[in-house]
Regions:
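Cytosolic, long alpha-helical scaffolding segments
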Residues: 2-185
Length: 185
């Protein structure tokens, strides 16, 4: 077994490609790949605090976008249940938790470095916003869990209630869009 593994080791990527061609994924099995922006947080950048702060801001923006997407999927699933979107909310929550851990740790290291007043303000702002994005993701998860529970119990809203939920949902999405745009600038 060891010899066979060693012989086939260089062909790993080719074998994976062959396997996926032989047994393709169905649409339900396909999972959207989410790049991990926390890879931008290299400890070597801590020697250049201004650059490290810029990288943190970029990761914060990606975290905001993930929270926004999670909230949109959750809101949509309340009135029009979609198992794929609900699963994505759970995945996004895990990813956002990962971002919070990585970014929080990096910001703690960065806050011990000599920072300009502007960079110090940015780091402080990132700490606050990071918690807000994580909280938004938690609320999205709660909505997704409610949607799952309603689906399992075969409960639905009246047409009037659905209409009101769609109106409120669109308003929340617009507020989130404006918030993410404001955070970016």
């Amino acid at each position: 077994n060891i010899a066979a593994t060693l012989v086939l080791l260089p062909f790993g990527k080719v074998l994976v490609k062959l396997a996926t061609l032989t047994i393709p994924e169905t649409e339900d099995e396909k999972v959207e790949e989410i790049p991990d922006a926390t890879k931008l947080l290299d400890t070597r950048f801590l020697e250049k605090p201004a650059f490290a702060v810029a990288q943190c801001k970029n990761v914060g923006i990606e975290m905001a976008k993930l929270a926004q997407r999670s909230l949109e999927y959750a809101i949509d699933s309340i009135t029009d249940y979609d198992q794929k979107k609900v699963k994505d909310v759970f995945r996004l929550e895990d990813m956002i938790d990962h971002y919070e851990d990585e970014l929080g740790t990096y910001l703690m290291k960065l806050s011990g470095k000599p920072l300009s007043d502007e960079d110090n303000h940015t780091v402080s702002n990132l700490f606050h916003c990071m918690g807000d994005f994580e909280r938004i993701s938690d609320h999205a998860l709660n909505l997704a869990e409610t949607a799952m529970e309603m689906q399992a119990k075969e409960e639905t809203f009246s047409e009037k209630a659905k209409g009101e939920l769609v109106t409120y949902g669109e308003a929340v999405k617009e507020i989130m869009d404006l918030s993410v745009e404001a955070y970016k600038s």
